[in-house]
Amino acid sequence: MTAVQLIVGLGNPGPEYEQTRHNAGALFVERVASAKGVRLSADKKYFGLVGKFSHQGRDVRLLIPTTYMNRSGQSVAALANFFRIPPAAILVAHDELDMPPGTARLKQGGGHGGHNGLRDIIAQFGNQNSFYRLRLGIGHPGDKNLVSGFVLGRAPRSEQEKLEACIDFALDVLPDMLDGNWTRAMQQLHSRKA
């Protein structure tokens, strides 16, 4: 059971990307910070917004990279290397095209599935992909040529509400994730109906 030491929320920086589908991971970390009473602050050393809270006597760090999505690994590696956090103690929250809005799944390892943020993190860790992922469903536009505009667009209210509900449920499961009780966290999260 590997306990989480770092939670990363992927997204793009700037007001033009706020509330876009691609920023679902960043929204999750913002919600964690709010629930834990943590103020995220910019730190140039880690190329992101960072925060920290205590869980059962140990530090858990939060990170939202302020690099663009395809350079997320620069931020994650900078913080993880400084604090000597192994990939298996990292949870990366990100948007997932291949799942409908309102669904969330946990996974350890695997490829990047075309997600540029995951691709860069894996590359920065020297192809070590043992970090955990919280995959937040955003749906698919139905045509691969429409993906870029889709992920960079804002979801209609009904989809956004589903995403926010699944993030709230993931927050309920967070204590198990933090403790490394991955099987129990997966059972709870994966049994939820969107």
Swiss-Prot record:
**Stabilizes the basic form of H active site to accept a proton (site feature) positions:** 95
Reaction(s) the record says it catalyses: an N-acyl-L-alpha-aminoacyl-tRNA + H2O = an N-acyl-L-amino acid + a tRNA + H(+)
Q: Which residues bind tRNA?
A: 17, 68, 70, 116
**GO MF, one annotated term:** peptidyl-tRNA hydrolase activity
The record places the active site at 22
Query: Could you provide one GO biological process annotation from this protein's UniProt record?
Result: rescue of stalled ribosome
Site for Discriminates between blocked and unblocked aminoacyl-tRNA, residues: 12
Q: Which residues cross the membrane?
A: none
Q: Which UniProt keywords apply?
A: Cytoplasm, Hydrolase, RNA-binding, tRNA-binding
Record's GO cellular component terms: cytoplasm
Q: Which domain of life is it from?
A: Bacteria
Enzyme class of the recorded protein, top EC level: hydrolase
Q: Which PANTHER family match?
A: PEPTIDYL-TRNA HYDROLASE (PTHR17224:SF1)
Please report which protein family the annotation says this sequence is part of. Answer: Belongs to the PTH family.
Return the NCBIfam families for the record.
pth
Protein name, UniProt field: Peptidyl-tRNA hydrolase
**Organism from which the protein derives:** Azotobacter vinelandii (strain DJ / ATCC BAA-1303)
The record's gene field reads pth
